[in-house]
């Protein structure tokens, strides 16, 4: 979680997007907020997406 947290904070502060891999699918977006259990992101397609951190397989900075 600590490595994910670093990317979440970077995305939130710098308004940079991340790509999340979840069960073989990808979701892209910028972090709005996060806590110990979830991360909330927005994208061009969706205004609000809430992802369970326990479901995330990988995260990459765009």
Regions found by a protein language model. Give the residues of each.
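Short glycine-rich, low-complexity segments
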Residues: 1-28, 35-38, 42-62
């Amino acid at each position: 979680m600590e490595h994910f947290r670093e990317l979440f904070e970077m995305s939130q502060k710098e308004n940079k997007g991340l790509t999340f891999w979840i069960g073989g699918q990808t979701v892209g977006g910028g972090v709005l907020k996060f806590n110990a259990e979830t991360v909330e992101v927005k994208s061009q397609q969706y205004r609000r997406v809430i992802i369970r951190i326990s479901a995330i397989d990988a995260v990459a900075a765009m």
